[in-house]
Curated annotation (Swiss-Prot):
GO terms for biological process: defense response to fungus; killing of cells of another organism. It comes from Arabidopsis thaliana (Mouse-ear cress). It is found in: Secreted. GO terms for cellular component: extracellular region. Disulfide bonds join C35-C53, C41-C58, C46-C60, C74-C93, C80-C98, C86-C100. Keywords: Antimicrobial, Disulfide bond, Fungicide, Plant defense, Secreted, Signal. It comes from the Eukaryota. Its main location: secreted. Residues 1-29 form the signal peptide. This is Putative defensin-like protein 298. The keyword Repressor does not apply.
Amino acid sequence: MSASKATMLILFALFLSDILLVSIPRAEAQLIVPCKTSEQCKSIRCSNGSAQCVNKQCQCPSLKQIYSVTDVSCKTVSDCVASHQCPTGLSACIEGKCICLP
């Protein structure tokens, strides 16, 4: 009886560790504030500089893109590494496109 409990505990631990690996976020959260002029963005506090009105949304200059999508199609990460579009070891294949990670 205790062997089956130990087995169930091990299986549950493996299941839990798998869930934690899958739930890695892909993007940073952003506050979207509509605007027509940069004057309307003065109330937004940015960590580096002041917010500007870009494409009718207030944006901080310190926000950076998490990754850049390339035009290279892929099936695996090896396809991305072979394309030499990203620094070594900083590429991934997501939804059939190579992306460069920061």
